[in-house]
Amino acid sequence: MAKAGGITNAVNVGIAVQADWENREFISHISLNVRRLFEFLVQFESTTKSKLASLNEKLDLLERRLEMLEVQVSTATANPSLFAT
């Protein structure tokens, strides 16, 4: 009977080792995917900041042009004789 108990114990250890291996593999996959997600988010943030900065510069330029046009229109409205040909 001692032999049967030893085999059962060995089988239980084998099952436990297999389960532990599967758990470690699962955790490894989760860790890798979390790392990939983090790297993507860092890259996304960097790209987004760069694009937003570029758009902000373009918007500032457009705002300055609009202000200049508003001044020209108000000047033309106030003094139409300046633009008469």
UniProtKB/Swiss-Prot annotation:
Single GO molecular function: protein-containing complex binding
Coiled-coil ranges per UniProt: 45-79
Keyword tRNA processing in annotation: no
GO cellular component annotations of the record: cell periphery; cytoskeleton; plasma membrane; SCAR complex
Main location: cytoplasm
Cellular compartment(s): Cytoplasm, Cytoskeleton
Keyword Coiled coil: yes
InterPro entries xref list: BRICK1
Tissue specificity statement from the Swiss-Prot or TrEMBL entry: Expressed in roots, root hairs, hypocotyls, cotyledons, stems, leaves, trichomes, and flowers.
Annotated keywords: Coiled coil, Cytoplasm, Cytoskeleton
A biological-process GO annotation: trichome morphogenesis
Known role: Involved in regulation of actin and microtubule organization. Part of a WAVE complex that activates the Arp2/3 complex.
Summary of subunit composition and partner proteins: Binds SCAR1 and/or SCAR2 and/or SCAR3.
Family per similarity comment: Belongs to the BRK1 family.
Stated name of the protein: Protein BRICK 1
Organism: Arabidopsis thaliana (Mouse-ear cress)
Gene designation: BRK1
